[in-house]
Amino acid sequence: MNVTASRRTSFAGWAGDHALALDTLDSRLAVDDLEPLRDIVGGARVVALGESSHHIREFYQVRHRILRFLVERCGFEVYALEAPFTQGQVLDGWVRAGPGTVEQVAADGIALSLGRCREMHETLTWMRERNLTAAAPPLRCLGTDLPGAAGSPLPALEEVAGYVRRAAPEALAALEQAVSVARRFHDPVTITALGRYQSLGPGEQDLLTSALSLLMGHLQRLALVQRARGHGAEHDTAMWHLRGAWYLDQLHRANAQEGFESASTFRDVYMAESVLRLLEGGTRVVLAAHNWHIQRTPAADSQGNPLLPAGAHLAAALGDDYRAIGVTSSLGRTTTLGEPTPERPQGAWYDAPLPPPAEGSIEAAFPTDRLWTLADLRAARPHIDDAASFQHSRMADYFLDIPVFEAFDAIAHVSRTTGTDHVLTRAEG
């Protein structure tokens, strides 16, 4: 008889006895309680922090405390967000003593109003204050996602216009063609921009694709020259804006043929590549994105076709240098995204009941008699006999099919959650 196997227990039993029980989410308190996190992280170059729902107060707080630990104790230098790379530049400027208020830069730099809450403001403010007082290299805060809330390439095209005029005026015609088409369907609301693109004629759609390809090819050909002139960083940034615009064009085309579920994974390719390009020189990165985006494993759409999240790309590129920490909860409230309103043009986030943990969900295994719990799934696996049974995890107000022990290296479980101060309560009746 295998003695080791006979001594195995359930994950619920292991979590109750061995997972790290934590009793504070206060971002101001010392992070000594998170010292066991060091074993989860190891020498990883990228640590991803998830969330099962957006606009959850406690999830922002969990991320803030873990970010502090990774920065203060492990030397991480970049906080990369599920936010547009192009518009997110204002965040990086602000945390390094740039102008403006935290409320304004968070609203401008983070799509879908995910920056419009006190908890995100507190994280950005902590980063700025640390940069003003610490002798260490400055913390950076960068977006990783497609431009225009993954709806319009216009912000990226406008961002590179000045560089194109200076470095490659002969490419202005291609830029102007792309801008002229982008303006025809531009809208800050993602779903509106997606619909307007579909109303373009095939000739206009082809013109946009052609112009973007010509522009990218022409600028890429100048890379060596621009670097020799000392403009390498500016050139690389301009190319990254354009790459986001190009991927977004591909998303629009795929949306018409495959549907948005599949097309949206162009976001994930770009998010993963945006993180990987930050790793030069040994930089370590914390990525904050939804649990779906950070999972290590491929997913599938409703027809069974493969979907590749950003985490799958990062795991393939980095192997053991990538860690995915899912963040979820068992009790309390969650949020759902409703239709845009004049006051909430990017969509209104509404409070919603949190269904009880489903059978076979990872949430069902966690104790709820503490504020939150951090469980190292990799450490647990040799000691449990039911890892393969956990095939579900929360996504907003429902449960997603996901092989939890393959998808995540650790789980941060908050016992009870609430919406942020930006979340609305639906009117009765």
Where are these regions (language model features)?
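Structured catalytic-domain cores with a bias toward divalent-metal coordination
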Residues: 1-429
